[in-house]
């Protein structure tokens, strides 16, 4: 196929018929009847064909009917327990965002502004789940980023532009589809400024990241390398308009309640005539978060320009024990339903008794992990049973009660064969 002789006979040197590169400049040269093509041109042709197929056959109208805020809220109710105010705020913000993308500008030339979202709520309150559920409902690309891994360009860590690269990967580098996507940036509170005062040292993972995110969130043309990097000199960077992408930032904001309390505490002034600030009333975390103002976020460590790019603020409440029990059983993809489906594949029914559900919720409350800690508790309790079940025959039912959750006993196995059940009990 190629001539590897090094006898100085240049007439035998083979070249790609498309890009003109010699056999020594490419990894592979494929021969046809008096024609040759290199591996780089093959890759380029594949990319062109994929794009044409997507444009002709794969193109379908996206979101032919934009769900109303009521429908968005109803869909969120199916998967997320509680957080009614946050759901309403999100439903309106998301509806307005995609309405803006469809309308462009109104007849009188008024350009609609972009409304990105800031979610404030304790760990395990449902911030990530809300964002994921919205993306599924709207059938748009969705990606998550961890703000703690981001640094300014030129420093060790992840550049903010990598967020757009991840979004493109989720939709097979379809720029149009990516520009309708949703990006969720978690742990946004971790990039707060280290202090209120400007520092002489560069804060590359705090204020520096906030500065880097400003343009991306507000709207800019981000240049992203094509799929697999720049394999071919003719390949250009993909241009992505981030003004059409909805950014949702979320964080637990530990300590923000103290900042709010300092601002809202009764009384002010100094001296004999000053009112004493009252601390008699115990204010919950949820009540404090409900009173958050932009000035509190500035004092916490977010720069004013960054807060300005996140005009829609939704606060999530702490989940109590009853809410955690609801999360275990009520959503369409509830945790107990998932494990019951898993056991059903082994031909066994899984039953969680009421006292078991309360014990799981109580344990999660003690760990202060919210809904996020529920899976690890259930997984730990059912580990031995899931290990043994595939090797045991005639098991028709597995029962989990409070004693199992507390580690006092193993889950009860009920067999089709009563004699075997009696033997296991002995």
Curated annotation (Swiss-Prot):
Gene Ontology CC terms: HslUV protease complex
Residues that bind ATP: 122-129
Keywords: ATP-binding, Chaperone, Metal-binding, Nucleotide-binding, Zinc
Ranges for domain ClpX-type ZB: 4-57
Molecular function per GO: ATP binding; ATP hydrolysis activity; ATP-dependent protein folding chaperone; protein dimerization activity; unfolded protein binding; zinc ion binding
Gene Ontology biological process: cell division; proteolysis involved in protein catabolic process
Amino acids binding Zn(2+): 16, 19, 38, 41
PANTHER family (alphabetical): ATP-DEPENDENT CLP PROTEASE ATP-BINDING SUBUNIT CLPX-LIKE, MITOCHONDRIAL, ATP-DEPENDENT CLP PROTEASE ATP-BINDING SUBUNIT CLPX-LIKE, MITOCHONDRIAL-RELATED
Known partners and oligomeric status: Component of the ClpX-ClpP complex. Forms a hexameric ring that, in the presence of ATP, binds to fourteen ClpP subunits assembled into a disk-like structure with a central cavity, resembling the structure of eukaryotic proteasomes.
Record's function text: ATP-dependent specificity component of the Clp protease. It directs the protease to specific substrates. Can perform chaperone functions in the absence of ClpP.
Family statement drawn from the similarity comment of this UniProt entry: Belongs to the ClpX chaperone family.
Protein name, as recorded: ATP-dependent Clp protease ATP-binding subunit ClpX
Organism annotation: Tolumonas auensis (strain DSM 9187 / NBRC 110442 / TA 4)
